[in-house]
Amino acid sequence: MSHPALFINGAWQQGRGAEFSKTDPVDNQPLWQANAADGSDVAAACEAARAAFPAWARTPFEQREQLVKRFAALLEEHKSHLAATISRETSKPRWETLTEVQAMIGKVAISLQAYQVRTGVSQTAMADGASVLRHRPHGVLAVFGPYNFPGHLPNGHIVPALLAGNTVVFKPSELTPQTAEETLKLWQQAGLPDGVINMVQGGRETGEALAASTDIDGLLFTGSAGTGYHLHRQLAGQPEKILALEMGGNNALIVDQIEDCDAAVNLAIQSAFISAGQRCTCSRRILVKRGSEGDAFIERLVQVASALRIGRWDAEPQPFMGGVISSAAAEKMLAAQHHLLSLGGKALLTMQRLESGSALLSPGIIDVTGVRDVPDEEYFGPLTTIIRYNDFDEAVRIANQTRYGLSVGLVSPQRERFDHLLLEARAGIVNWNKPLTGASSAAPFGGVGASGNHRPSAYYAADYCAWPMASLESESLTLPASLSPGLSFN
């Protein structure tokens, strides 16, 4: 049954747009139903954020800090409930969504540290005064959230934006509306002033209306490259608006020399199939050196991947992974596999739908070595490819043969190999003997090329949430001892 699912100026409201719903990805049972925000709802949310901005920006930082800390405490208190909500909507296992909520809590501490270090106040003494650097909020920021981490990734935009003094209009993915609703209720419970965060639910039309609003001063986005490019075009010619895009990747894992085969296979499994392959840093390409060592690695990879436990989020014992986000997404993944096979790829492990109409998919591994015209696409699911190479220079060239530039990784005991990769890699994240999906919130997160700009959702998020204000200051004014040539007071 539809319910008030928009949060505007501190109140829950019924949307005026079309009704939409969310179902369980595994069994298609209804989970959530409400009306989307139409253009007038979006306008009201942006107006509320604009009206709330002056007072929020002038609120002492210590008060903004305390409110964000209260939100973190509420996340801790409601961790199990929020994790279960995320699991039901995404089908990710409970063990994984509990870590997501914990990451949301940790992001508060990281954001507080980042605000002080990267966007606080600094002063440099000069002979006749001081040079002072301060930072000021942009104003109203639109935040677009993804479905794969519907709590953690929007949180990585919203928390630093609020700390900097911005107000927010949040548009979550239409595939995870309930997680967004539960999260906003915690912000409300934390005592957030009316209008500081507003939420509009809906799909493409809602998003386009928000991006087109003249009341926003910037847009922070995490999601697919296709949507990111669309938003970039929509905001073209508006340099006054900050635009931060974190998009996808066609990431390569280079398996060069193997000391422990099972350790290398575990790293590859974590890189390719964690979250059912629905992380932007997942390895879509595994590059394996030709030879018996590489053959043994691939054989073991297929063996272990074929035995992965897949199931419902609340199953016991817990599965390694659940399904993809929807039955439609599962269909797209199966179509992608079919296309790779039609091009000449060889199925080493065929991805299969485990239940009719369900989003549960088994992992797929396709050898595309020597196959021409393989699409440079991010297949967002449990499907990876194998490409064999002859030498390390060739591996690096293959890794860089993508319009994306998010992550690349190396399995090798040789530091020299990693140093080589660091020099040649075109990627924002370069890992050595660590899963591609591993990242530190204390480090930048993001890439180059079609993977986006700026570094959302991590320590460097503070950079795009405030603009620098430079001042030359002196408490008194005196005539210089030495005047400029041609200037006289005689």
Curated annotation (Swiss-Prot):
| Catalyzed reactions per annotation | N-succinyl-L-glutamate 5-semialdehyde + NAD(+) + H2O = N-succinyl-L-glutamate + NADH + 2 H(+)
- Source superkingdom: Bacteria
Q: Give the pathway annotation.
A: Amino-acid degradation; L-arginine degradation via AST pathway; L-glutamate and succinate from L-arginine: step 4/5
What SUPFAM superfamilies does the annotation carry?
ALDH-like
Residue span of the signal peptide, if any? Answer: none
**What CDD domains does UniProt report for this protein, alphabetically?**
ALDH_SGSD_AstD
Q: What are the UniProt keywords, alphabetically? A: Arginine metabolism, NAD, Oxidoreductase
- GO terms, molecular function: succinylglutamate-semialdehyde dehydrogenase activity
Q: Which Pfam families does its entry note?
A: Aldedh
Read off the InterPro entries from this record: Ald_DH/histidinol_DH (IPR016161), Ald_DH_C (IPR016163), Ald_DH_CS_CYS (IPR016160), Ald_DH_CS_GLU (IPR029510), Ald_DH_N (IPR016162), Aldehyde_DH_dom (IPR015590), SuccinylGlu_semiald_DH_AstD (IPR017649)
State where NAD(+) binds. Answer: G223, S224, A225, G226, T227, G228
Q: Which GO terms describe its biological process?
A: arginine catabolic process to glutamate; arginine catabolic process to succinate
Q: What is its EC number?
A: 1.2.1.71
Which residues are catalytic?
E246, C280
Q: Which family does it belong to?
A: Belongs to the aldehyde dehydrogenase family. AstD subfamily.
Q: Sorted alphabetically, which PANTHER family does this protein's record hold?
A: ALDEHYDE DEHYDROGENASE-RELATED (PTHR11699)
Job of this protein: Catalyzes the NAD-dependent reduction of succinylglutamate semialdehyde into succinylglutamate.
Instruction: Note the HAMAP family from the entry.
Output: Aldedh_AstD
Q: What is this protein called?
A: N-succinylglutamate 5-semialdehyde dehydrogenase
- Source organism: Serratia proteamaculans (strain 568)
